[in-house]
Amino acid sequence: MFGKDGRGGKIRTVSVDGLDCALMEPPLSKRSQTLRLADLAATQAHPHHNMTGFPGLGSHQSHSLPAHMHPGELGSDPGVALTPFGPEHMAQATALKLSPSAHPEAQTAAAFASPATVSYPVAHPHSGYSTSRDFILRRELSTSAMLGEQHPAAGSPHHHHHHHPHSMFISSTGSYAHPEGVGHPLFPAIHEQAAAGVHHPLNGQMRLGLAGELYGRPEAFRAEHYAASSLHHSYNSMNLNVNIAAAHPATAGAFLRYMRQPIKQELICKWIDQDQSSKKPCSKTFSTMHELVNHVAVEHVGGPEQSNHICFWEECAREGKPFKAKYKLVNHIRVHTGEKPFPCPFPGCGKVFARSENLKIHKRTHTGEKPFKCEFDGCDRKFANSSDRKKHSHVHTSDKPYYCKVRGCDKSYTHPSSLRKHMKIHCKSPPGSPTNGSMGYPAVGTPLDDPLSPAQEQVRGRSSNLSPQVTNLNEWYVCQATGATVNMHTASSNADSSESEDDEETYRHSERTIR
């Protein structure tokens, strides 16, 4: 169909590989560089002359198919797409396709879209074809790919399903939030390949023998790139540790395991050998916990022939008090080494424990098991550990062993949680208090709007010189049993755990040295 454009354009016939196609040509003053390049590519007879500027990226010149031409639907934007597909595939127009057709039937030709489709690129739900601004740098792992190995294009009629080449690339118009999960732009070799029958829109992209970094520029007017634009702007180099995790949170761990730099640490054995007269620590260093534990077990603890099960770790709080069994000594040494060989088996938990009993108690938080029933008649309360049941028993006995330690306050409570709520009345946190919020309320017991007396100032001065652990003890409330001495309770004894878990808190203050 021949006609004349209302703006003074003219119709001319262009032969593309022997097939005559009607092409509308606007006046020379209105023709853009993009259309000139398109005409040059369409009429060029030599396969190595191309419009991309990269040798070897020209299209095949034989067995081409005529493109679907709609001259009457020419939009205002002259930078239309060069695509072998029909109008149903014209959702991503307005750009120049840099990817060569890897199959003879997928020949590139000039086409025009309606003004509605050329105003801005729209994400087609089943297309991942990149535009000229998707400047892709790929680094092939196989030498055959660098020698010209080709793969079928994404829109080729012949759907050959094979693995992606092992490469790394980023496409600014890739499907970051594709509904079907296809078209992943980052590291396709890391995740599982797509199921059969799904197009691989990233096949057939142009290969550049460049060993550079990855660069990408997102479309500023594309909706799915609003989230990605905060990660990489303009042509800045991308941080792989951040962007991979943002694009593929499920598969980033497999890649980041190889990206993390190993942290070098030295574990020092501080066991004091009693056979030496100097009584100096062993001081041998180890790079892994496994090596340190084996060293202590073999060299210091000894085998069944050892009758005295005493811990000689430097500055051990037991001060030479023996254990009744070897396994108890082994469990105690974990307080010093920091070993926790019992991980929680539930997915996503990640907690580890030094004692199997503590792991058993912890697993009840996942299973909901509460084997400890209240011993008082008429009460159906059940608990996951015995310590919680003990705290609950004070409700029935009317005992109030948890006293407020603030001077001038004689309040007492049956449960530590009630005392914690009461302490909020008295307490205010100083600026930058490290223990603030550790158990749900500020740690320093200073009355509100009450100036400190000289005696209180001296007490505060002395407590500030104490170690952090001693300071924490002074800042906690007093649990005073009837007719018993005053006992200071730390956070570990009030947590929802068994009394055997008190050893877990001491691991935080262990003598293990890490450099």
From Swiss-Prot:
Pfam families the record matches: zf-C2H2, zf-C2H2_15, zf_ZIC
Q: Which GO terms describe its biological process?
A: central nervous system development; neural crest formation; regulation of transcription by RNA polymerase II
Q: Where is this gene product found? A: Nucleus
- One GO term describing the cellular component: nucleus
Q: Where is the composition biased (Basic residues)?
A: 157-166
- Species in which this protein is naturally found: Xenopus laevis
Q: Which UniProt keywords apply?
A: Developmental protein, Differentiation, DNA-binding, Metal-binding, Neurogenesis, Nucleus, Repeat, Zinc, Zinc-finger
- Main role? May bind to DNA. Essential for neural crest development, converting cells from an epidermal fate to a neural crest cell fate. Does not induce anterior neural tissue.
Q: Name one GO molecular function term.
A: DNA-binding transcription factor activity, RNA polymerase II-specific
Extract the SUPFAM superfamilies matched here: beta-beta-alpha zinc fingers
Q: What is this protein called?
A: Zinc finger protein ZIC 5
Gene transcribed to yield this protein: zic5
